[in-house]
């Protein structure tokens, strides 16, 4: 299942012929599924030439993310934060760093990471940061930390190979994204370079753009599931078992769903590159719409494919089972009704397009 179509690029806004350049990358990703060091090397190679959002090729960036995730959801989960870290640094005017990078911006109860001034006027990080994916295998990360007093949080560039960095043992029992454990990291006076001042990390347009890039990854994983379903129907038809009306209706539903989600991403990419924020809608509201639209599409596709294919491939097909489990965890980065409530609150205050 999926052997003939899973490395096809995902089309968002390019012409199909333009996507052919992605094929060697997708083949390399497929050859190294489950091999995290190799996938990090691939991410580093991609990062040298990948476009930044907001510079005229946002749609191509999202096609890259979606296409890699369609081959392997975990590979997309590795690639996206590396590219996001490079984009964050570039947006602040910093040079592109060497090595594999991540972004650690989560907060957790009972865990606090503080940035303190050192004797030379720079910063050192002290404390703990939760949800640090692959920290032990990365070279560096963009990390948010609390500034002294009531200044809020700022983003810092940090060398994760510093001896003051201690990666905790992840209590990772997940069946999805098993090769990408997230766990706590302890920082003991680790030197850190401030990227920009307090509030910049969350207030910059790139924060919303990055959130939509994650949605492109989700959609890529769901499109791979849809391709699995379509292939299964085609194989059955070749054996004389034509799809019934329910299966065809569900495939049609999936087709419409993918088209709508793709159109939402394409429209957002076009706006980002044209620097045309709507007069009545903030950048973050736009991101909430896109992420919500794509997350709903992903969950719809997951439900329809699972109902039609039944338990067989979940139990006996490694690639399909892995994709399903990986995507189910990844899409939970969307906060469902809480994100919709945030969007609704903004809409009520006039931050809407209708």
Regions found by a protein language model. Give the residues of each.
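A generic N-terminal leader/anchor concept
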Residues: 1-50
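Glycine-rich phosphate/cofactor-binding loops in nucleotide/flavin-utilizing enzymes
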Residues: 2-12, 311-354
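C-terminal helix-coil-helix/basic helical segment that borders enzyme active sites and/or dimer interfaces
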Residues: 27-30, 260-293, 303-315
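Glycine-rich flavin
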Residues: 29-137
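A generic local secondary-structure boundary/capping motif
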Residues: 112-115, 129-133, 142-147, 171-177
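A short core secondary-structure module
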Residues: 132-167
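Glycine-rich beta->alpha junctions and the first turn(s) of the following alpha-helix
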Residues: 174-259
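Generic structural signal for well-ordered, non-transmembrane alpha-helical segments
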Residues: 220, 252-259, 288, 292-299, ...
């Amino acid at each position: 299942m999926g052997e003939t179509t899973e490395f096809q690029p995902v089309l968002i806004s390019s012409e199909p012929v333009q996507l052919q350049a992605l094929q060697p990358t997708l083949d390399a990703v497929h050859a190294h599924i489950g091999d995290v060091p190799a996938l990090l090397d691939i991410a580093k190679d991609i990062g040298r030439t990948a476009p930044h959002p907001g510079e005229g090729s946002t749609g191509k960036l999202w096609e890259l993310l979606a296409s890699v995730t369609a081959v392997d959801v975990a590979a997309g989960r590795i690639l996206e934060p590396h590219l996001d870290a490079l984009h964050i640094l570039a947006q602040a005017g910093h040079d592109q760093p060497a090595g594999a990078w991540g972004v650690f911006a989560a907060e957790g109860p009972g865990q606090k990471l503080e940035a303190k001034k050192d004797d030379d006027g720079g910063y050192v990080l002290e404390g703990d940061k939760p949800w640090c994916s692959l920290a032990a295998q990365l070279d560096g990360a963009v990390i948010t930390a609390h500034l002294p007093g009531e200044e809020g949080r700022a983003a810092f560039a940090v060398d994760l190979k510093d001896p003051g960095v201690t990666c905790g043992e992840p209590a990772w029992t997940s069946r999805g994204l098993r090769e990408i454990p997230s766990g706590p990291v302890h920082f003991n006076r680790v030197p850190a370079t401030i990227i920009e001042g307090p509030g910049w990390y969350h207030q910059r347009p790139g924060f919303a753009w990055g959130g939509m890039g994650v949605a492109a990854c989700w959609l890529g994983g769901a499109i791979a599931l849809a391709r699995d379903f379509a292939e299964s129907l085609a194989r059955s038809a070749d054996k004389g078992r034509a799809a019934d009306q329910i299966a065809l209706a569900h495939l049609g539903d999936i087709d419409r769903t993918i088209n709508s989600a793709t159109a939402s991403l394409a429209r957002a990419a076009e706006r980002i590159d044209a620097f045309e924020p709507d007069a009545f809608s903030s950048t973050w509201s736009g991101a909430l719409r896109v992420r919500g639209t794509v997350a709903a599409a992903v969950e719809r596709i997951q439900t329809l494919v699972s109902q039609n294919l039944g338990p067989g491939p979940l139990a006996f097909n490694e690639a399909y089972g892995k994709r399903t489990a990986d995507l189910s965890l990844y899409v939970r980065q969307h906060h469902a009704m809480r994100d919709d409530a945030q969007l609704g609150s903004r809409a009520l205050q006039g931050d809407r397009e209708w």
